[in-house]
């Protein structure tokens, strides 16, 4: 293998969901585990040199220190079963590498690279290293690929090369949640951990949408009244935004909106019932047997 599989101009897009999954895996890891390890899933666009990391799942492993030797065992059967289950829901996602947490590369990186090289087929696996210690108040993420080094007929070695282009993709639906989290971080509420009802978020998003529509209408009216020079880029952006919205009459839109609201309320009701049932089961489990 060589580094030719990944050019320095290759754009790597990382979905924010993956970072949250890695952080959750680190927080939920067993007490005996020093780090969290898992599989990275995503898509490759070979024509445009774009790699998108869209999903991940944790893989169980065991770490054992015997003298100066550190043993690392990955549950490969569990990893295969998780990938098969993921393929049922997201068949377009393929294995593109693995992730681990820590300040630096672990001694098990070479063994993990060998395993994921077989899983990735004819391309090199990527390794995403996430420093969950938040040094300097920053979540550090580094992306590596393994390069085989050595002389022909001699001993071969593995060198992990840093891929400098790691772009966090915040252009999708996740941007709404990220903006809300950023708002809560900059202006925290007095009651920490308090979750607002879903309809409150819908009302805030609707209010923000109304403000943006007023801004757009003001711009259009100024252009029509020749108070402002038209901008072609803004015009194309408005055209793309309008053409992306399906043309519906008021009655069809009302029915569709009410149906979505009913589905959301039903989901809230079911999740509340499940939460109540789990709390009751937990309390009943502590009752003494008679």
Swiss-Prot record:
PANTHER family: EUKARYOTIC TRANSLATION INITIATION FACTOR 3 SUBUNIT F, EUKARYOTIC TRANSLATION INITIATION FACTOR 3 SUBUNIT F-RELATED. PROSITE patterns: MPN. Component of the eukaryotic translation initiation factor 3 (eIF-3) complex. The eIF-3 complex interacts with pix. This is Eukaryotic translation initiation factor 3 subunit F-2. It is found in: Cytoplasm. Signal peptide: none annotated. One of its GO terms (molecular function) is translation initiation factor binding. Keywords: Cytoplasm, Initiation factor, Protein biosynthesis. Component of the eukaryotic translation initiation factor 3 (eIF-3) complex, which is involved in protein synthesis of a specialized repertoire of mRNAs and, together with other initiation factors, stimulates binding of mRNA and methionyl-tRNAi to the 40S ribosome. The eIF-3 complex specifically targets and initiates translation of a subset of mRNAs involved in cell proliferation. GO terms for cellular component: eukaryotic 43S preinitiation complex; eukaryotic 48S preinitiation complex; eukaryotic translation initiation factor 3 complex, eIF3m. Its main location: cytoplasm. GO terms for biological process: formation of cytoplasmic translation initiation complex. Belongs to the eIF-3 subunit F family. Residues 12-150 form the MPN domain. Pfam families: JAB, MitMem_reg.
């Amino acid at each position: 293998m060589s580094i030719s599989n990944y050019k320095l101009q290759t754009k790597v897009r990382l979905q924010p969901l993956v970072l949250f999954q890695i952080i959750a895996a680190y927080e939920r890891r067993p007490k005996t585990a020093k780090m969290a390890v898992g599989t990275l899933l995503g898509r490759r666009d070979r024509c445009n040199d774009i790699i998108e990391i869209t999903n991940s799942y944790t893989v169980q492993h065991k770490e054992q220190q015997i003298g100066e030797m550190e043993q690392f065992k990955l549950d490969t059967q569990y990893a295969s079963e998780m990938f098969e289950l993921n393929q049922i829901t997201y068949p377009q996602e393929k294995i593109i590498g693995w992730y681990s947490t820590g300040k630096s590369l672990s001694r098990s990186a070479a063994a993990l690279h060998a395993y994921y090289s077989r899983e990735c087929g004819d391309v090199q696996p990527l390794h995403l290293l996430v420093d969950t210690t938040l040094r300097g108040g920053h979540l550090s993420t580094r992306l590596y690929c393994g390069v085989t080094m050595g002389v022909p007929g001699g001993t071969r070695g593995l060198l992990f090369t840093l891929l400098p282009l790691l772009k966090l993709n915040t252009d999708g639906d996740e941007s709404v949640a990220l903006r809300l989290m950023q708002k809560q971080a900059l202006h925290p509420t007095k009651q920490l951990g308090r979750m607002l009802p879903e309809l409150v978020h819908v009302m805030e998003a609707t209010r923000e949408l109304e403000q943006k529509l007023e801004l757009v209408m003001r711009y259009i009216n100024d252009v029509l009244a020749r108070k402002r020079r038209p901008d072609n880029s803004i015009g194309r952006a408005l055209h793309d935004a309008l053409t992306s919205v399906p043309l519906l009459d008021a009655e069809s839109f009302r029915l569709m909106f009410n149906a979505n609201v009913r589905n959301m309320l039903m989901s809230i009701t079911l999740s509340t019932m499940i939460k109540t049932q789990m709390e009751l089961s937990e309390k009943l489990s502590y009752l003494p047997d008679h």
